[in-house]
């Protein structure tokens, strides 16, 4: 089990949190690229998947519920896992946060189920909340698409803005690629979108430029 440990001096007003596998991958990309004045966090039910990320703050969701083995592509497990860690999530967001970006790949268990829980806490705290999510490739099947649609409907209840990236559109742009390459493009686009918006906000709004 990974220990939740919030750095004492880390309290930027803009935070980016990656939820689940896709969201965590995107935030890892962003962290490696580097954005000043933004705090990065990843949270997942899959403890092993988080270990390889250089992002310094990692929150394992639902350790008691899942045993660190993931949500099994079941959104209700992702939701209940986030509810298990409500106080930890709140502790992250309460430290002077003015704007929150939530990145997630929808269609699986953790991103789909946990992202709306995090968004609801953010809304409750009066934080400007932006969701940036991907929806599955068609070849991933009808069930994942239905899960993604449910996740979008839940997120819309709590976020101030929601950017939806359709993975099938990426296939149209990049053509037929190996499966790993296709998912890599999805992570890259998710990362680029969040990074671009966060940088615009950081430079033009909060710096007073």
Question: What does each model-identified segment do?
Answer:
Residues 1-209:
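Tubulin/FtsZ superfamily GTPase core signature
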